[in-house]
Amino acid sequence: MKEHVYFVNAHPDDLIACMGLCMRLSTEERFEVHVVDVTRGERGLSSKGVSMTECAAIRTKEEEAVCGAMGLKSQWLNEIDGEACASKQACQALADMFIAKPPRAIFTQWPVDRHLDHMVCSTIALNALRFSAGVTAGQMKTVATEVYFYAYASNSIGFVPTHYFPMDEEAMDKKFALISKYECQNGVGMARQDRIES
């Protein structure tokens, strides 16, 4: 029986912060990896005059291409980029995923961040875990789920890493190629920056 691992991200390209680990776990027989995005990144091209609907379609397609290259499917909670607020509907939708396929581990964004959607993302993940576990007298009934946070050097505040994931040159090249698929968000530039920060 496979163990379920969830990567819960605010936007389609936020997976880049933990791409190496996602790549590795997606090749492990014992794990089924789930990529869940809170929003479709609808406002990611607003400075270029692209409508939210068109932007969502572009970014959804890019995320599906990246996930598809790893043999994964992306799932969506349908909050709106820039307006995500950990709605009960989003938390319950993720909780329903957790109930159907209980998580062994959850990787999500560090909750102290300059981007509000990043902050909300971890709240949704933790609320969904709480909803799926059930609560008695304010205490979660059972939780055997590991929760890990990832961060961005430019956005996250006060994050001190405690775990590192080693990658060889071949894995870095694959990671670079995957990140480059996020073309509308300057994927090649992000991949170069990520390589420098790694």
Enumerate the language-model features and the residues they cover.
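Metal-dependent de-N-acetylase/amidase catalytic core
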Residues: 1-8, 28, 32, 54, ...
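Glycine-rich phosphate-binding loop and adjoining beta1-alpha1-beta2 segment
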Residues: 41-73
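ATP-dependent adenylation/pyrophosphate-handling site
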Residues: 3-52
